[in-house]
């Protein structure tokens, strides 16, 4: 099994505490509300929403995938770090065993946030992950992030 790591960085004018509440802690409610074409719904299959919780994410009709299941590996509300692993679903091919993600929000000097995301693709055998595959996923994540940021800017009293 090989592991391929990719890192991404975004910036936002939204401070980490507010962005973490919306983009991480309440994503299961907010994203289907503002981007139903991307995510139809999210439901807890097992657990209480904390570490170890298993969630099923059903994608919207505009997605190339039907659903995925992920397991929450870590939530650090004080340092704004969230990690989870994609463990099941049609986004995983016969070449990928799982994908682990870590998102960390860091305060920027202008009062906003720097969002640092690390993706670890755990492959079956000696398979290599093509950059195009990763780039497409990064673009979708960037688009969802921008929608959340726009929502927070338009609704300054939410997630305070």
Curated annotation (Swiss-Prot):
Keywords attached to this Swiss-Prot or TrEMBL record, sorted alphabetically, are: Allergen, Hydrolase, Nuclease, Pathogenesis-related protein, Plant defense
Q: Which residues form a coiled coil?
A: none
GO MF terms held by the record? abscisic acid binding; nuclease activity; protein phosphatase inhibitor activity; signaling receptor activity
Q: Per its UniProt record, what SUPFAM superfamilies does this chain match?
A: Bet v1-like
- Tissue-wise expression: Highly expressed in roots. Expressed a low levels in ripe red fruits.
Which Pfam families does the entry mention? Bet_v_1
User: InterPro entries in the record, alphabetically?
Assistant: Bet_v_I/MLP, Bet_v_I_allergen, Plant_def-hormone_signal, START-like_dom_sf
Q: Which GO terms describe its cellular component?
A: cytoplasm; nucleus
Q: Which family does it belong to?
A: Belongs to the BetVI family.
Protein name as annotated: Major strawberry allergen Fra a 1.06
> What phylogenetic lineage does the species belong to?
Eukaryota, Viridiplantae, Streptophyta, Embryophyta, Tracheophyta
Which gene does this sequence derive from?
Fra a 1.06
